[in-house]
Design a protein with these regions (language model features):
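Conserved ABC ATPase signature
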Residues: 34-38
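Helical segment within the ABC ATPase nucleotide-binding domain
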Residues: 74-86
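A short, surface-exposed alpha-helical micro-motif characterized by mixed small hydrophobic
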Residues: 100-102
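ABC ATPase "signature
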Residues: 118-119
Length: 151
């Protein structure tokens, strides 16, 4: 509730949005616990809730689904996608190419601070001969069998 108030929401609106979010991510039974009593994944869900409580125009997220199982990854991506469809611009860092395919209009592939590709998903795939984003990722970053391979 504190963060909603901090972001200018009324106490009633903050309480409702907080309750709705906790229900959406399956944490209603943890509503009265201190953050340090939650697991890492639960804390990460709460951090997303704090980020989106006031429906910002821009969401900047750093690996929002890192460490989650497929069920919770999909849940969080659904929440992020809802905000995107409501008009929010979403900028995020991820190593999950299916998340890029699902949410991104444009993408930048970076390695060591250098942009290797930028454009729509179709443009990036075309640049790399129609390969899947996973294959492009492996080509750009290498794989465990050939870590020295460079573009």
């Amino acid at each position: 509730v504190y963060f909603g108030r901090l972001k200018g929401l009324s106490k009633i609106d903050t309480k409702k949005r907080s309750e709705d979010f906790l229900k959406q991510v399956g944490l209603t039974d943890k509503a009265n616990l201190r953050l340090d009593k939650l697991s890492g994944g639960e804390q990460q869900k709460i951090q997303l809730g704090i980020t989106i409580i006031n429906n910002p125009d821009i969401l900047i997220l750093d690996e929002p689904t890192k460490g989650f199982d497929p069920v919770n990854r999909r849940l969080l991506m659904n929440i992020i996608e809802e905000h995107q469809k409501a008009g929010a611009t979403v900028i995020f860092v991820t190593h999950q190419m299916e998340e890029v395919e699902r949410l991104c209009d444009r993408a930048i592939l970076l390695k060591d601070g250098t942009a290797y590709a930028y454009g729509t998903i179709a443009e990036i795939k075309e640049k790399f001969g129609g390969a899947s984003l996973d294959d492009i990722f492996i080509k750009v970053y290498g794989d465990e069998n050939n870590a020295e391979e460079k573009l």
